[in-house]
Amino acid sequence: SLIQFETLIMKVAKKSGMFWYSNYGCYCGWGGQGRPQDATDRCCFVHDCCYGKVTGCDPKMDVYSFSEENGDIVCGGDDPCKKEICECDRAAAICFRDNLNTYNDKKYWAFGAKNCPQEESEPC
């Protein structure tokens, strides 16, 4: 679920997903089009693609199970679909953490769809 995604971002990247990633670049937040603008925006693009491959459950609403082991997030549970959602969220949170050094809110926060032409969109 989106609430769990926020939790994973806080645990892994030590940032609030809502405040740092909900309206960044062309892909962080609802929807997405155009070219990813930087490494962080690419994290969101890849996350969107990951969610797009999930079938049989709702990535934004369905609750999955995870645990922390030796500082790492481990996705669990018996439902393969929900585990897949967790793996998408886990990978994005790690990607955010690994790209904090190039995060540029002055340039890409509230970037706007007008700067993300649909015709420049790339396939997953």
Curated annotation (Swiss-Prot):
The GO annotation for biological process reads:
arachidonate secretion; lipid catabolic process; negative regulation of T cell proliferation; phospholipid metabolic process
InterPro entries named among the record's database cross-references: PLipase_A2, PLipase_A2_Asp_AS, PLipase_A2_dom, PLipase_A2_dom_sf, PLipase_A2_His_AS
Q: Where in the cell is it found?
A: Secreted
**Annotated S-S bridges:** 26-116, 28-44, 43-95, 49-124, 50-88, 57-81, 75-86
Q: Which cofactor does it need?
A: Ca(2+)
Protein's UniProt keywords contain Disulfide bond:
yes
Q: Name one GO cellular component term.
A: extracellular region
Q: Which Pfam families is this protein grouped with?
A: Phospholip_A2_1
UniProt-recorded Gene Ontology molecular function terms: calcium ion binding; calcium-dependent phospholipase A2 activity; phospholipid binding; toxin activity
Cross-referenced CDD domains, in alphabetical order?
A: PLA2c
Active-site residues annotated for this sequence: 47, 89
Q: Where does Ca(2+) bind?
A: 27, 29, 31, 48
Q: Which tissues is this protein detected in according to the database? A: Expressed by the venom gland.
Catalysed reaction(s) here are: a 1,2-diacyl-sn-glycero-3-phosphocholine + H2O = a 1-acyl-sn-glycero-3-phosphocholine + a fatty acid + H(+)
Q: What EC number(s) has UniProt assigned to this enzyme?
A: 3.1.1.4
Q: Which UniProt keywords apply?
A: Calcium, Disulfide bond, Hemostasis impairing toxin, Hydrolase, Lipid degradation, Lipid metabolism, Metal-binding, Platelet aggregation inhibiting toxin, Secreted, Toxin
Q: How is the cofactor bound?
A: Binds 1 Ca(2+) ion.
What function does the entry list? Snake venom phospholipase A2 (PLA2) that inhibits ADP-induced platelet aggregation. PLA2 catalyzes the calcium-dependent hydrolysis of the 2-acyl groups in 3-sn-phosphoglycerides.
- Family affiliation: Belongs to the phospholipase A2 family. Group II subfamily. D49 sub-subfamily.
Name of the protein in question:
Acidic phospholipase A2
What organism is listed for this UniProt entry? Gloydius ussuriensis
